[in-house]
Amino acid sequence: MNVEFEKEYLAELYEKGKTDDKKHRFHPQIISGYLKCVKALLNAYRIEDLYQYKSLNYEKLKGDKKGLSSLRINDQYRLEFREITNASNQTLVEICSLIDITIIISRNYEYNS
């Protein structure tokens, strides 16, 4: 599949393995997991090919994240992306964000308590 990056820091992480800005610094294990996810997207001919990688835990997101899908980088981070199918039925993947899901889970826990 073809892969594009919505934000510059995501492209830098893929190309250089690090970012120049101080806001988006990640642990080396997170970066290697991110690279593994991007390579899986690049090697897949279609979205269904991602199901064979059980460790990536591919899923379509629901609720306020409807329209996005995700791959699990590790227990703490996930890679969110948008699947775009063009007129010739080819899928383009636009990588949107690298999310720390522990923050999201703790916020939901606070709201539901």
Language-model regions, residue ranges each:
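Enriched for short, Lys/Arg-rich terminal
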Residues: 69-113
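Amphipathic alpha-helical interface surfaces
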Residues: 6, 30, 34-37, 57, ...
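Arg/Lys-rich, positively charged N-terminal/basic patches that mediate binding to nucleic acids
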Residues: 1-38
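A short, surface-exposed loop/turn module that caps and links secondary-structure elements
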Residues: 46-69
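Short, contiguous, well-structured surface segments enriched in hydrophobic/aromatic residues
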Residues: 33, 37-53
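Short, solvent-exposed polar/charged micro-motifs at secondary-structure junctions
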Residues: 15, 59-62, 107-110
